[in-house]
């Protein structure tokens, strides 16, 4: 009985309906409209499914209509296949409005689903995108405002567009179509990992996140708690983002160990007495 109930709960948890006011029907808007068609399939958190996407954008100051049959001559910004999943940890668990991650692909996953780089709503060409779901933020502009405040000072900041989202004919509300951080001409300027004369070369991208992935690196240091003391019950874990763990098999031997050593060297410096040293201190590891 317990296993049966657990399975039913898991299935229900992945069929998230629109949030409050589910009876609201989108008719027209000055924002682009993103139509996602999953053909009734269940959207999951860990595995991607094949879906279709169609983006209507008649231009700045123009009205976009949700009834495609009644308005067949609207401008289609992009139409094609995507691999779709839910995304986020806190943003997923603490919100009734679920964020999505998707990659643009040339054909369905069942037929190979090779990724294809495209420009969506004027954003730089790439294949990795997210739909942020402003739920607690009733202004729906805090994420975008933060991006814009950081843009003059950082080498790269995600660009984004507010959009209306419709999934399988149901209106899900206003989302923020956003570039996902990653390696690419229009994203982060990272060099491919490789080898030169026995030395490992290239760039790696990791992030501090929860230890809910199958493979991660746990720091040998514990974090500080709210009262300024070390909390030995908690851990700092690094997730492999680029390259991902699955890519290590195709990279030079020792790549994972090299990433871990780089993390150790950085943290040892931060925890050492000479962390302020102008040459070998934190400036060696952080772009300040």
Model-derived regions: residue spans:
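Phosphate/dinucleotide-binding and metal-coordinating scaffold of catalytic cores
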Residues: 10-288
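Hydrophobic h-region of N-terminal signal peptides that target proteins for export
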Residues: 2-10
């Amino acid at each position: 009985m317990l296993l049966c109930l657990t399975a039913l709960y898991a299935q229900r948890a992945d069929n998230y309906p629109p949030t409050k006011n589910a009876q609201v029907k989108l008719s027209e808007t000055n924002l682009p409209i993103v139509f996602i068609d999953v053909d009734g399939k269940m959207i999951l958190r860990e595995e991607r499914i094949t879906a279709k996407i169609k983006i209507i954008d008649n231009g700045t100051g123009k009205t976009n209509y949700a009834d495609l049959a009644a308005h067949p001559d609207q401008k289609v910004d992009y139409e094609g296949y995507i691999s779709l999943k839910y995304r986020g940890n806190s943003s997923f668990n603490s919100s009734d409005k679920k964020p999505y991650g998707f990659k643009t692909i040339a054909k369905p996953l069942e037929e190979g689903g090779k990724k294809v780089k495209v420009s969506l709503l004027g954003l730089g060409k790439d294949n990795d995108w997210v739909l942020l779901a402003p739920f607690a933020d009733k202004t729906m502009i805090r994420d975008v405002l933060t991006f814009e405040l950081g843009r003059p000072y950082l080498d790269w900041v995600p660009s984004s567009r507010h959009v209306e989202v419709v999934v399988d004919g149901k209106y899900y509300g206003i989302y923020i179509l956003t570039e996902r951080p990653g390696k690419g001409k229009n994203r982060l300027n990272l060099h491919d990992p490789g080898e030169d004369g026995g030395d490992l070369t290239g760039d790696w991208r990791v992030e501090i996140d929860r230890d809910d992935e199958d493979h991660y690196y746990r720091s040998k240091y514990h974090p500080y708690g709210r009262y300024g003391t070390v909390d030995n019950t908690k851990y700092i874990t690094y997730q492999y983002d680029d390259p991902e763990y699955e890519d290590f098999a195709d990279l030079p031997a020792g790549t994972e160990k090299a990433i871990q050593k780089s993390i150790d060297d950085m943290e040892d410096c931060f925890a050492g007495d000479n962390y302020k040293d102008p040459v070998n201190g934190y400036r060696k590891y952080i772009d300040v």
